[in-house]
Amino acid sequence: MEAYFDNSATTKVLDSVKDIVVKTMTEDYGNPAAKHRKGMEAEQYIRDARKIIADTMKVQEKEILFTSGGSESNNMALFGAAWANQRAGKHIISTSIEHPSVYNPLGVLEELGFEVTILPVDHDGHISLKELEEAIRPDTILVSTMYVNNEVGAVEPVEEISKIIKAKNPSTLYHVDAIQAYGKYVIRPKKQGIDLLSVSSHKIHGPKGVGFLYIRNGVKIKPLIYGGGQQAGMRSGTENVPGVAGFGAAAKEMYTNHAEKVQKLIELKDYMT
């Protein structure tokens, strides 16, 4: 019997996910942009998944943008917010323990003339809230932090971070990389003051190659991909119906009886330690 302990890297898909992925690949295979029956059937899977995911966070369905995964979501949050808001300023704040899909785009933005402040973390992986407050300026347009670190497991106090940001500069956007948090924590972007939030499907027993970016209604952000105008013009390209459908199935499973699942994980952790 194989015991797999690398679920922070990726997860095995659930049977319910596998079933809906196969069904959308072999039976309901239409292009969701098509106006005939097969297309409308495919589009319904996307609508259903978007509703499921929006409901898990108590946000509007139109605030969920499907992507090819966490890296694209992070890239769009950073580049899209920077390009759309650069008239207000060109200063961005992040931390020293971000994923390469955040850290590397910040390097590119620096090459393009943006100023990036990288905050250090303590030995537990947490940023100093005092240093964050001191770093925020009138021209700070974006702060980007992880929710849960993928290597050391540090959990950042995102709601406290947001309060500091909005108190110092209400127009500064707050992006959260929640790729290791979604499915494990109850996430409420509205309550927690999060403007942009990245998630990946394969971290929650869904398919690889699909994710989403939560974009709070009213946030100014530009697309990364231009073309046929899918997803209200924010992310062109024919949608990955099997991936999105599988993502929705995984999200539904993760947040059904969520408290009981979390308690079981805590018991297993305590047993192993």
Per-region residue spans from a language model:
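Pyridoxal 5′-phosphate
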Residues: 1-273
